[in-house]
């Protein structure tokens, strides 16, 4: 990676970034579904792919993040942009459609704040925890009895496959960010390995749905109609295209 444009950076910042990158190479986070690539031309930028964990509405989805490191790193946190968007879906209370990532570790939310002992690895592990069951509980004021909780889960598990898997694998214009092209071989390998599991999940949903269902999540102004039969067809078409 080049540091040609970073002559104003301190030796501490450069040394720390190089050490963080070395650590994530030597101790990869792939067991957590986390993949990281540092920009080869700009030492102040990095890219991450987090694959949605099993047993969550995000299972198998491809979630992208772009990291911009400040000149005084690690004394200040990086700016992290969330880059998996499509159909104007708010995929998580902490991940905004405009790309904002709202967590205390990055000093963008209340709670335990950033300290210089944090690393690229701890940032990515923290982001991974957002892709959990019942993500709406991360929204202030929402409890397990809230009427939107299960509706939101249904929307996310549907749109996870529609947007974060199908549209991403098809590299749909306006959805798949070209800057993450380097992760596509990883995505394809994961998709081929898990395609039958996800197919069975969709088939089960389709068999138990008599007609399309529409859900409104007022706090995010989301109105989504779920049609598993249509999604099943689109997913089978994707398998034919990729295999």
PLM features: residue spans?
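Charge-rich (especially acidic), low-complexity segments
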Residues: 1-4, 137-243
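Short amphipathic C-terminal alpha-helix that caps PH/PH-like domains
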Residues: 120-131
């Amino acid at each position: 990676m080049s540091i040609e444009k970073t002559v104003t950076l301190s030796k501490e910042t450069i040394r720390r970034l190089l050490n963080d990158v070395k650590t994530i190479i030597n101790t990869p986070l792939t067991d957590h579904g986390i993949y990281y690539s540092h920009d080869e031309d700009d030492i102040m930028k990095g890219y991450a792919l987090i694959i949605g964990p099993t047993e969550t509405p995000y299972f198998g989805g491809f979630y992208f993040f772009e990291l911009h490191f400040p000149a005084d790193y690690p004394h200040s946190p990086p700016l992290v942009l969330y880059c998996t968007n499509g159909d104007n879906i708010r995929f998580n209370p902490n991940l905004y459609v405009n790309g904002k990532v709202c967590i205390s570790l990055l000093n963008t939310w209340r709670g335990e704040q950033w300290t210089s002992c944090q690393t690229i690895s701890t940032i990515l592990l923290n982001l991974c925890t957002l892709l959990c069951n019942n993500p709406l509980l991360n929204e202030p004021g929402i409890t397990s009895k809230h009427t939107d909780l299960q509706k939101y889960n249904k929307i996310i598990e549907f749109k996870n496959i529609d947007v974060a898997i199908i549209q991403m694998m098809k590299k749909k214009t306006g959805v798949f960010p070209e800057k993450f092209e380097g992760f596509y071989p990883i995505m394809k390998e994961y998709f081929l390995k898990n395609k039958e599991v996800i197919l069975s999940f969709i088939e089960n949903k389709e068999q138990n749905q008599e007609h399309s269902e529409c859900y409104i999540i007022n706090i995010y102004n989301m109105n989504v109609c779920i049609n598993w039969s249509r999604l099943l067809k689109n997913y089978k078409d994707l398998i034919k295209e990729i295999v």
